[in-house]
Amino acid sequence: MKTQNYDESKIITLSSLEHIRLRSGMYIGRLGDGSNIDDGIYVLIKEIIDNSIDEFIMGYGNEIFIKKENNLISIRDYGRGIPLGKVIESVSVINTGAKYNDDVFQFSVGLNGVGTKAVNALSSKFLVRSTRNGKSFEALFSKGKLLESREIKSSDKDGTYVEFLADSEIFGKYSYSEDFLKRRFFHYACLNKGLIINYNDQIFESKNGLLDFLNSEIKSDDLLYDIVYYSSKTLEFAFSHTNNYGETYFSFVNGQYTNDGGTHQTGFREGFVRAINDFLKKTYSSTDIREGLVATLSVKIKDPIFESQTKNKLGNIETRGNVAKEVQKIISEILYKDKILAKLIEKKVVDNERLRKELSSVRKEARERAKKISFKIPKLKDCKFHFNDSSKQSEQTMIFLTEGDSATGSMVSCRDVYTQAIFSLRGKPQNMFEKNKSEIYKNEELYNMMVALGIEESIENLRYNKVVIATDADFDGFHIRNLLLTFFLTFFEDLILNGHMYILETPLFRVRNKKITTYCYSEEEKQKAILELKGGCEVTRFKGLGEISPNEFKGFIDINSIKLTKVDLFNIKEIKEKLGFYMGQNTPERRNFIMENLI
């Protein structure tokens, strides 16, 4: 299709704040409605709090007061305050700030001069007030545009106050989750010992840093030994082993949670293995040493380089070696001092090695069996690009885990063959709760799915950025969804912890007349559509994905319109108990729950 009238009039120039409003995803990631912890409204809060914490790190102000009234957020710190003559520029002009100067800020996340400006641009109301030496300067903005400003005398303590209301024109209907906010504030407190966060009169404070953090994430009964903890000015970590599968990490850079890891996390993993092997004077495999390891890590570095604006993965090359060297040294010293701890870790490593060798024969049989069937993975319709290659499209790659040939057929014919793969399940997968990992290799379908994802050894080889469960919106579909989540939570929980697991949202209803067709994802949306079409309309209830035609399905899985719900783990210590209740033995408690909630 040819583009008509491409001339000078088609070239437009946007101001920095206009660009933020038009392309908000470049600055805050997804928009969302507040139902997901990664939604943009939480990023707005984070950007302001980051500035307050930067003040605390530099030794100015150990309290941050945060209030939420409906959706109006206010944040007050007692740092140095923004220089009064630069308040307006500091919150409205891109690339303006003091964090380019090491004398003022040494360990900061917000080094790009964008964060606060993005909050300003994306808020219908944005008020900033800076107080220094008995004077205050305040400025009021709306959607990034200055409405008024003034300088006044003040008896308040030095510091900065920010109040904002996220713009409903950008975010639509949204609300903040109290659980998400409190979880984040607790993390801030653990990452900054001595910092007090007062949120609506609830205090968040940590005396033991990441030790408190890891204790909140793991049940003490699951620990094979007491949590090992270390802290210095630029490196802090805590770890222990459990009997769970895989490795679990919570890593941070200058207070920023890096759920995709990065060079600091790689350095920790390498240093940990070297320390154990050096102490034991053996050459155990890294898998045997780290299987079941749960660790949290925080580093403070100058000029952090992240792989995106949302700062999920650290890219500083030199950090890997520096962290590995220090971790190896510290853990070696700890092992030499604590012989009981050393024996417990050695026992875990030896047990891991034994189990791996026992598993190897089962693996070999499964691979030989798979070779006889096909050189390709059965039931996999693969895509051209993958997450573990170096293509520009790697971030867009996804695999749909669906059930039945009819649903698969609709999706195959309308998918993007470059970035969207499909793995078709044959009925309900096996319930893997409390099963041994060897059971995967005895189950052809689960084995093929694991190989298709590339996660047999670890999720470092994950072939798709998003693993999307796409099942029917009925009880059977929900059951299959739960069985798949049980499988991943049991053997590959880090796949979910690192934000790769999603649920495909497909419409429940189609409401249409001769001119308009509306797809509805809830009973509420259906009733609204019926009212808008004013009678005489046809209502179709989709019982299964196979009932949706390929032409319709194309709109539901198109990269620009797909609706995905991210699977979040709020607290890993609750996983075993929750899975036991829903997927374990049919206890009287579960029967009562079903009677009270489903019948």
UniProtKB/Swiss-Prot annotation:
Annotated Mg(2+) 2 binding sites: D472, D474
Binding site for ATP: Y6, N51, D77, G110, L111, N112, G113, V114, G115, T116, K311
InterPro entries named among the record's database cross-references: DNA_gyrase_B_C, HATPase_C_sf, Ribosomal_Su5_D2-typ_SF, Ribsml_uS5_D2-typ_fold_subgr, Topo_IIA, Topo_IIA-like_dom_sf, Topo_IIA_B, Topo_IIA_B_C
Domain (Toprim) ranges: 397-507
Chain positions of site Interaction with DNA: K428, N431, H479, R590
GO molecular function: ATP binding; DNA binding; DNA topoisomerase type II (double strand cut, ATP-hydrolyzing) activity; metal ion binding
Catalytic activity: ATP-dependent breakage, passage and rejoining of double-stranded DNA
SMART domains: HATPase_c (SM00387), TOP2c (SM00433)
GO terms classed as biological process: DNA topological change
Record's subunit section: Heterotetramer composed of ParC and ParE.
UniProt protein name: DNA topoisomerase 4 subunit B
